[in-house]
Amino acid sequence: MPRQGNETSCLFGPVNSRRLGRSLGIDLVKFKTCTLNCVFCECGRTTQLSVERQVFVPTEKVLKELNVFLNGGDTQPPEVLTFSGGGEPTLAANLGEIIAALKTNYPQYKLCLLTNSTLLSDSQVRAEIKPVDIIIPSLNTVSPVVFQKINRPAAGITPEKILSGLLDLRREYTGQLLLEIFIVPEINDTPQELALLREAAALLKPDGVQLNSLDRAGSEDWVQPVSAENMQKIK
């Protein structure tokens, strides 16, 4: 389930994920603080549109909550610890510190990061996330006009910058990279847009590509899911 914004814990789940197995979510960002205001976001509209990295949840609180949860004797412990939630995880200035601590204290768990890719052009961000086992970045378009329609970014973010950051990450990162593409009918599913996305994916050479469509209500009512027939055609 998406985050609602009224949670007091930075942990959520675990949930059984098709992609990851049993996953415990770690949310390091104040609810709906993001670099984008995507029309399809199941957490709702972004209330704090920003590219400024800061500490939202103290490292000590995160590690304490994890210690309590992971040593609580859960009969179905998680397989993966996943950085995600109600905002963009790479906005957390202590992300790298937390990743390093988890790798040291809980090496038995895989780490996963879900990111909208907007801060991957920052070499510091890329260095911080390199120890993560699985990174799932998103790229929904490489067209500036469509990018504004779908993702509604903070100032200074462009699809060219995102793709450049993704390519830098691909060169530097040795873990599993799974590209996520969210399809919005009649916006980024035209033959021209899909051709551009295929070209970008061919350049990136991810370990896998995941096509997603609306599953729950997005932030804008006009966004509709892709039909199973059309999704199959896109694949």
Model regions and ranges:
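Structural motif
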Residues: 21-23, 38, 78, 134, ...
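Short strand->helix junction
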Residues: 31, 48, 88-89, 186-187
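Conserved AdoMet/S-adenosylmethionine-binding subsite of the radical SAM
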Residues: 91-226
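Glycine-rich beta-strand-to-loop/alpha-helix junction loops that act as flexible
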Residues: 82-88, 116
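Short, basic/glycine-rich phosphate-binding loops at helix/coil junctions
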Residues: 41-46, 77-81, 142-146, 177-178
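Auxiliary Fe-S-binding modules of radical SAM enzymes
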Residues: 1-22, 33, 64, 71-74, ...
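Canonical Radical SAM [4Fe-4S] cluster-binding loop centered on the CxxxCxxC motif
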Residues: 18-60
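Conserved alpha-helical substructure of the radical SAM core
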Residues: 45-82, 93-97
